[in-house]
């Protein structure tokens, strides 16, 4: 095997913003609610329904960007990422890519970032995980599968995306 290549590993980490309403409509976010009880024409993608930005999500994202040393964009834009999945009622996802809200920045790693029961201690002085961007997007609905059937819970459609465990990130290092 040639030694001319250097492995480059990138991570895409999703964080769920704790907001009272969905990303682009006023439907409440209540996890564990009865399926399909928190939906509206906007999050179901019905004709004529227009999205309205969740101001709370915008503020939380800007605050996060400032805490992580990102450049906060003067102008950002949202795109419709088109694809078809049964749990995407609009056949597109509202997301950001080339003009995100936050650019650059980084997450400083410290010894305290590792759980006390970690198997080995890793010196992390001056180590920073560099960020490319922080952007906002909505989540898709939740598919569930039973023994003889499947269903879709649209309560989650249009919410900020679900979080992934911070521990899973620490395990990579």
Label the model's feature ranges.
Residues 1-173:
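Basic, nucleic-acid-interacting segments
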């Amino acid at each position: 095997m040639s030694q001319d290549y250097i492995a480059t590993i990138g991570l895409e980490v999703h964080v769920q913003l704790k907001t009272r309403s969905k990303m682009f409509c006023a439907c409440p976010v209540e996890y564990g609610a009865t399926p399909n009880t928190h939906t509206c024409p906007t999050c179901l993608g019905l004709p004529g329904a227009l999205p309205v930005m969740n101001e709370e999500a915008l503020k939380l994202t800007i605050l996060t960007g400032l805490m992580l040393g990102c450049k906060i964009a003067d102008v950002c834009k949202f795109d419709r990422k088109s694809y078809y999945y049964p749990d995407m009622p609009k056949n597109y996802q509202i997301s950001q890519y080339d003009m995100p809200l936050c650019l650059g920045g980084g997450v400083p790693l410290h010894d305290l970032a590792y759980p006390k029961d970690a198997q080995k201690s890793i010196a992390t002085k001056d180590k920073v995980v560099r960020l490319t961007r922080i952007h906002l997007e909505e989540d898709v609905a939740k598919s569930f599968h039973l023994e003889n059937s499947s269903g879709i819970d649209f309560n989650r459609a249009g919410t900020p995306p679900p979080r992934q465990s911070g521990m899973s990130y620490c395990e990579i290092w």
